[in-house]
Amino acid sequence: MPLILQSAEESNRAYASRLEASFIDKNSKKMNIDLRDAVSRNFGFGDFIFINPRTMEEVARVHNLKELQNVIFSVPAESLQYHIIRNHVSRWLYSRAIFPVAEFLKQIRWEGLQDIDAHRKIIFEAIVKYRKMKNQGVVAVFQRDRFDRYSHFARIGDGSLGGKGRGLAFIDNMVKRHPEFSEFENASVVIPKTVVLCTDIFDEFMDTNLLYQLALSDADDDTILRAFLKAKLPDRLVEDFFAFFDVVKAPIAIRSSSLLEDSHYQPFAGIYSTYMIPYLEDKYEMLRMLSDAIKGVYASVYYRDSKAYMQATSNVIDQEKMAVILQEVVGTQYGDRYYPAISGVARSINYYPINDETAEEGTVSLALGLGKYIVDGGLTLRVCPYHPDKVLQTSEMEIALRETQTRFYALDLKNNGHNFSLDDGFNLLKLTVKDAENDGALDYIASTYDPYDMVIRDGIYPAAVS
């Protein structure tokens, strides 16, 4: 327990020194300032300052949990040992109400372990575990100095997340509440890294650039898109985007999330645009592509098909607002193209149950490559999660050969977006399954038809039909 000794007698400073207590001179004109500094320094408030125990000089300073995580392996051993013996780390965490980590580290005594490298690892892993736990299921405000690979979901702005954004936040929260999702070996159940530009950013963009008059007019889609592309996004977003690029280091999907989207009785799937951009080392080129994609999603609210759908569903177009989801694209790079081994679309209601299936059990449509193939109505593998061994397409040889997927979508990593257009798939490649076989992407997801034995075998085999 840190001590503070207050006295009007200067001679008592020696007693304070022997007790390793802070001394406050009551006769000092700045007594209140000295007291505040002593409390901040000894009770864990303020920055955590690592000191050299021999010289008492500062060797490192951290402002928050992320910075402590970053420096824990570089702090000199004698300094870290000095603070561990005195429980300074746990005290600092207590003062910030980070109780789980503080309680855990307080129990790890130097006398019991006496291994500085082990202490470093324990502190680091405790912080990482806590930050992962806190970040899941929470829509935190995006802070560029704190967003890192342990962050999952954040928002920029104070408006609505939109329908799709709310759905993703709900799923993230559900994953956090069900630890059984972490029980699968070599499988991590998480949503991709996500940042949502809330609807107030959309409002600011529309108002600042005076776009409403054109957007609500009868102008054609291309005219609306070109006007939106010429408009400017708020300058303050630039540094946030750069911070997001530094963490994700992967292609990014720019997805619509309007107020009305994903409502239960009025699905908006395929109405608004979704763009993808490749990851580039040149941040400014990525910024240009990302800005164009965000503006393209905003513009899609006012395309003719969108207005017609709004009218058909008895909604008012000038009341619609758009949030935008920036999301890491999960997949693997194969040369100049990028795609996942499997994409899926899950439906909570099975409208056409077969045999033992029930409507409440839902269905999943699975396909090779990007999910656009599924949304566009391509041939997919339909599976009921409750009956994974009973798949209609594999029940008979003729059906399996007739209804198997033959093409798929991949992101063209060479396309830098200079041909940006109304078609949100302008930089996607439509490839054959043979291309995926050459990439080695089918090894664990495909079966092969053997025409000699008239059977389907798991895996890929030469001189056969996949």
What are these regions (language model features)?
Residues 4-6, 26:
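Hydrophobic/aromatic residues positioned on beta-strands within the core alpha/beta folds
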Residues 143-183, 232-466:
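Conserved mixed alpha/beta core segments that line enzyme active sites in large multi-domain catalysts
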Residues 79-111, 192-198, 263-280:
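Amphipathic alpha-helical packing elements
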Residues 191-242, 309, 321:
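A structural-propensity feature for long, helix-poor, extended segments
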Residues 7-13:
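Negatively charged, flexible loop motifs adjacent to catalytic sites
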Residues 47-54, 60-99, 104:
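Eukaryotic low-complexity, mixed-charge intrinsically disordered interaction/regulatory segments enriched
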Residues 18-19, 34-45:
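Receiver (REC) domain switch/output surface
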